[in-house]
């Protein structure tokens, strides 16, 4: 897949403070790439540099192998969608979508044709004459996206666009966004702190921490093979266990809990159950390892967990192949 954007040893300083130390990243044409990390990790600053709203202190940004550091945002063939959609309250959906084209002196006929297609793709045709105050949060978000894609951008940049929505609507729109990206075939660069959001939508995820990239990979790679201690603790749940000079991560679903009446395997330790949590179709056991004093998490089905009570002595362990060594 062709690389559309290259970030080459880019740095961003604010005064004496280094927000992003040298950072490099290749973004493929047509992919859904998510930049994921906690608040203050530099993800929005990176997005704003790609968009042209911030200038790199050092390094180069390339679009189709052309340096764009000094190119203004409106010449980059990119559009940015913010969490707060900035819709014009006095304009209808259709007029909001057409506003940018009107400023660019696009003919009325072409405005109508392109707006029609954008509204069709975002399922807004029936709302074309409504004003933002008469729309739900999800509909407003779709208007913001329609307004962005109507200009046929090469890249769509999205800065936590679902952050202000309730859980159910957010889940529905995650699916809509991914389907929209597939239909459009354009590159999406999506910024979020929500790991579940990143996992459900992305082709690849860039995990950031303190201005650095910790890991780049597919959702499955990030989940199953975290490379660093930060990724292992930030993405999903992991048991982090000291192993010599370093650490290994074991997902709770790979930790086995057995009765003390069963023959013990050499990899298993004696422990006792400190707590049991109901988590939907599973139960989460918290087991204190008597040998290491580690508190381990293990998932079991409700049927499997029915045999246990808080305080029970058990054997706890896992297969070596389920350990992931961390840097």
Curated annotation (Swiss-Prot):
The keyword DNA repair does not apply. Pfam families: ABC_tran, TOBE_2. GO terms for cellular component: ATP-binding cassette (ABC) transporter complex. It is an enzyme of class 7 (translocase). GO terms for molecular function: ABC-type putrescine transporter activity; ATP binding; ATP hydrolysis activity. SMART domains: AAA. Its main location: membrane. Its EC number is 7.6.2.11. Residues 5-235 form the ABC transporter domain. It catalyses: ATP + H2O + polyamine-[polyamine-binding protein]Side 1 = ADP + phosphate + polyamineSide 2 + [polyamine-binding protein]Side 1. Keywords: ATP-binding, Cell membrane, Membrane, Nucleotide-binding, Translocase, Transport. The keyword Nucleotide-binding applies. It is found in: Cell membrane. It is a peripheral membrane protein. Belongs to the ABC transporter superfamily. Spermidine/putrescine importer (TC 3.A.1.11.1) family. PANTHER family: SPERMIDINE/PUTRESCINE IMPORT ATP-BINDING PROTEIN POTA (PTHR42781), SPERMIDINE_PUTRESCINE IMPORT ATP-BINDING PROTEIN POTA (PTHR42781:SF4). Part of the ABC transporter complex PotABCD involved in spermidine/putrescine import. Responsible for energy coupling to the transport system. This is Spermidine/putrescine import ATP-binding protein PotA. It comes from Bacillus cereus (strain ATCC 14579 / DSM 31 / CCUG 7414 / JCM 2152 / NBRC 15305 / NCIMB 9373 / NCTC 2599 / NRRL B-3711). The gene is potA.
